[in-house]
């Protein structure tokens, strides 16, 4: 298995665009609040790791302005072409295997990335090494084991099916080397990496139209793998997608834990 094989959800499939749109709706307000908190402004140099779609990169580009720089990296940059112009530089890069794409960054940020990277220890070291002294690291990652249910209010057969399929999704992720308890470890890992003033918080939506869109796109994207692994039948998946489409189920997400610290 190569490091990039660790990622289950291919960015080139149509559903990836739907998923990135849902992440933006669900998590951008939280991410932008944290980025503002750690400090991003004109002239800053930022590395956006595992950028995926364009919303965070575009926001960072507006904050740093023409005098700044945003290096946006991903193992698959196919969704980033629209923002690949100064101050944004887009590079294909595996954060678990490649050298950092520069050094002396004021800010390094990754959202919902390291949980998927088999060598996340190396990835974290690389991100810290790319900071200037005084630079800020912000890592936001899921902790699906902390809140494993897509339907926390499991009150009927629709919700039970949804939670069973979610369990299958988690198994596929874990089999690919994802650490499903990663989010909670971030404060300790940041301190162990030598960062100062480490703090963290968590956020998850309990229901939202974007959760519905995310669930539909995710299940359509992994349906073949769920069936091949014997974790669900095509009938299960059709029934679940129809339930999701019908509305009325309160679909949540795993908590996203945001942790930040300063390089001494
Ligand atoms: C769940 S998506 C999150 C995308 C984006 N950060 C967001 O929050 O909307 C995970 C992203 O990490 C990327 N990724 C997975 N493994 C990676 C690795 N080893 N190095 C760099 N990027 C990786 C994927 O290609 C994908 O774009």
Where are these regions (language model features)?
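Conserved alpha-helix/loop element of class I SAM-dependent methyltransferases that forms part
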Residues: 25-45, 59
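Class I SAM-dependent methyltransferase SAM/SAH-binding core
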Residues: 47, 51-99
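A short acidic, Gly/Pro-enriched loop at the edge of an enzyme's catalytic core
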Residues: 99-108
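Residues lining the SAM
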Residues: 110-115, 140
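Conserved Class I S-adenosyl-L-methionine
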Residues: 179-184, 197-264
